[in-house]
């Protein structure tokens, strides 16, 4: 059993039922819907295909709606792409003008108020660098420091500038409402700056009458500075190394990755490492050695999941990429699991009742040589608390809620299943015997550690731990 999870971005390369079944069988756990591209109709069709493929394979698949976020972009160029050369002057304006080699509009009307003389402006993921010479009304006059080709709708980054854009654009709000109605299991918020950004997402969710976990994409320097508050406020984190490396020193990104992973584990929050993990496999059938090391090190650092972007959405080898990533992940896990139960920060102890029960369950399973950890969970929190200790035993999560089952596809080592509601601990134990026998995971007589809440079915009441020897019931 592979413990770490694989998130795959969907796109034209996998837009058939057969391809999605193959992706799931290859190891996809979470399907990412990138709302920077595609129409709502296209996303709905993909969603329906994912649910059908999940049902056919009998495997839980989480659906992640990734919102575009308030990305600042250029407008359009009248005659196609233009090439800027070092020393050229170039104007970015909030006026509606046809773009050319000397001027182009921007989608962000607040730009002139957010920059000043000497500020750095980056275009196209930092490939083109400009420096602000002056601001005259709606026009920002710049000089080209590093030239290159720019074209319609390329992104603009403003390192160090306090950009006054809302956490959610109008498009994001529309996309979020659609994704919630569609049935997504989790949402990712782009360009998070601080903990307050999650409030805007929750406000829309409450209006729609449906809350799902919100993932903070850490890709702004402000989010790095506020990482402890961001991790505490959000339900999970994505280390979005692409945009982060544009505005934040490239050489410091690996350390940010390690710090975020450690912080998320300490807080029992799932963490995804993303961007260029298997980039060469967009066009090649094998990854580079550096990519293999990157994936393995993310797992050794403690990531819950690794993510594929263009590799799976538009790449030539999407299924092969997932299979290869899965092999690399498994090899890294062998090293990780050989070290035994993973403590959190030395001296760090759980602060909650549920956290204490989870730690005790992992330690007892370790001491007794238990075969598995069984978590009855309504919200998924019990399973996530068990997950952070990276126990050698698989974690089987039983829940009555299909949404919780799908959300747990993001958590390390957790295999989640929907089961009927039980009202007593005796019924709970009987259910364990029946379900484990049905799954064929363990043998009669094997020791498992059960964690649950009493009374059953009430979120946040984890207070029970039981050592159980599986019976032959149901086999």
Regions found by a protein language model. Give the residues of each.
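Non-catalytic helical/linker scaffolds that mediate oligomerization, partner binding
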Residues: 1-475
């Amino acid at each position: 059993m592979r413990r770490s999870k694989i998130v795959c971005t969907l796109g034209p390369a996998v837009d058939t039922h057969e391809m999605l079944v193959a992706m799931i069988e290859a190891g996809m756990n979470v399907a990412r819907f990138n709302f920077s591209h595609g129409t709502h109709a296209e996303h709905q069709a993909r969603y329906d295909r994912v649910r059908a493929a999940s049902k056919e394979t009998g495997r839980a698949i989480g659906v992640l709606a990734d919102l575009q976020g308030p990305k600042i972009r250029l407008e359009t160029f009248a005659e196609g792409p233009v090439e800027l050369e070092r020393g050229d002057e170039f104007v970015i304006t909030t006026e509606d003008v046809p773009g050319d080699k000397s001027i182009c509009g921007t989608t962000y009307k607040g730009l002139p108020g957010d920059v000043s003389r000497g500020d750095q402006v980056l275009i196209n993921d930092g490939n083109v660098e400009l420096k602000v010479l002056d601001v005259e009304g709606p026009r920002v006059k710049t000089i080209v420091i590093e030239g290159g080709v720019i074209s319609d709708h390329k992104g603009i980054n403003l390192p160090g500038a306090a950009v006054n854009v809302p956490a959610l654009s109008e498009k994001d709000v529309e996309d979020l409402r659609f994704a919630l109605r569609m049935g997504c299991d989790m949402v990712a918020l782009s360009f998070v700056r601080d903990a307050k950004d999650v409030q805007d997402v929750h406000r829309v969710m409450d209006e729609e009458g449906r809350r799902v976990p919100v993932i903070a994409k850490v890709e702004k320097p402000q989010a790095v500075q506020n990482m402890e508050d961001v991790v505490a406020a959000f339900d999970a984190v994505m280390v979005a190394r692409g945009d982060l490396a544009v505005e934040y020193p490239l050489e410091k990104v690996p350390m940010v990755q390690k710090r975020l992973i450690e912080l998320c584990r300490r807080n029992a929050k799932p963490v995804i490492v993303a961007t260029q993990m298997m980039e060469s496999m967009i066009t090649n059938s094998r990854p580079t050695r550096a990519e293999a090391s990157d994936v393995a090190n993310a797992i050794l650092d403690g990531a819950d999941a690794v993510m594929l972007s263009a590799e799976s959405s538009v790449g030539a080898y999407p299924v092969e990429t997932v299979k290869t990533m899965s092999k690399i992940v498994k090899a890294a896990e062998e090293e990780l699991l050989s070290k035994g139960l993973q403590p959190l920060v030395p001296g760090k102890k759980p602060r909650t009742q549920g956290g204490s029960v989870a730690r005790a369950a992992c330690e007892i399973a370790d001491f007794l040589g238990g075969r598995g950890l069984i978590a009855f969970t309504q919200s998924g929190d019990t399973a996530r608390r068990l997950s952070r200790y990276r126990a050698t035993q698989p974690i089987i999560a039983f829940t009555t809620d299909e949404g919780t089952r799908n959300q747990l596809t993001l958590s390390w080592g957790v295999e989640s299943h929907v089961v009927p509601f039980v009202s007593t601990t005796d019924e709970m134990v009987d259910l364990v015997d029946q379900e484990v026998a049905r799954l064929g995971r363990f043998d009669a007589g094997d020791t498992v550690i059960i964690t649950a809440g009493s009374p059953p079915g009430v979120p946040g009441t984890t207070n029970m731990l039981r050592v159980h020897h599986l019976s032959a019931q149901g086999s």
